[in-house]
Amino acid sequence: MGQKVSPNVLRLGIVRDWENRWYAEKDQYVKWLDQDIKIRTALFKLLKDAAVSKIDIERTTKDLTLFIKTARPAIVLGQEGKNIEKIVLAVRKTVKNKKLIVNVRVIEIKSPDADATLVARWIGEQISNRASFRTVQKLAIKKALKAGAKGIKTAVSGRLGGVEMARTEGYLEGSVPLSTLRNNIDYALYEAPTTYGQIGVKVWINHGEVFKKERMNNSQIMAKPRTNKGGKR
């Protein structure tokens, strides 16, 4: 069953936390969920050069807090916090509320080579630039294991090398037990555009076992976040 379900979803409440953390009544739930999707889309576009892996959102009726997980915190913060102001304005524009209190917490990724989202994105970008799909997968695996990953699995699907028949090729190094729920498996999917069509890239990275029943939130697995409120440092 571990092969059929997203490892991220399968581990919610065990070793992973939800990306959206708030409570809303029925009439408000759909509105906030739609806003969260639009906020992430806008911010990933705004911060496309900042190597952003994940954006978590916490809400109350009066304020909204963003947890931006990135390998380049300096780019997200900007000179004298100018990019934070842009992020706050983008969020307020998306939710159509100029008075909303927006808090931004930037969390630095210590090992970007062991982050599934960044690894999948890097493999996809290299394939889009006509690099060998076999070479980039092997290089990504080597870097991930060197960065401390217990195991990594990669797979690319589509018209690989421009051939007529679509196929899937991948590699596995180390241990990646998808059905062991106490294993913190990081999973990501990326679609790489090429002249022959879309190439799907999947990455699974095993960060080891978590024996205590605790949610892996940002404060537990990352360094102390940097906080900015209302667009000011």
Curated annotation (Swiss-Prot):
CDD domains: KH-II_30S_S3
One Pfam assignment: Ribosomal_S3_C
GO biological process: translation
GO MF annotations, alphabetized: mRNA binding; rRNA binding; structural constituent of ribosome
UniProt keywords, alphabetically: Ribonucleoprotein, Ribosomal protein, RNA-binding, rRNA-binding
Entry annotated with the keyword Hydrolase: no
Alphabetized InterPro entries for the sequence: KH_dom (IPR004087), KH_dom-like_a/b (IPR015946), KH_dom_type_2 (IPR004044), KH_sf_prok-type (IPR009019), Ribosomal_S3_C_sf (IPR036419), Ribosomal_uS3_bac-typ (IPR005704), Ribosomal_uS3_C (IPR001351), Ribosomal_uS3_CS (IPR018280)
Domain KH type-2: start-end pairs: 39-108
Cellular component terms per the entry's GO annotation: cytosolic small ribosomal subunit
Family: Belongs to the universal ribosomal protein uS3 family.
Function of the molecule: Binds the lower part of the 30S subunit head. Binds mRNA in the 70S ribosome, positioning it for translation.
Complex and partners: Part of the 30S ribosomal subunit. Forms a tight complex with proteins S10 and S14.
Xref: HAMAP family: Ribosomal_uS3_B (MF_01309_B)
Protein name, as recorded: Small ribosomal subunit protein uS3
Species of the source: Mycoplasma capricolum subsp. capricolum (strain California kid / ATCC 27343 / NCTC 10154)
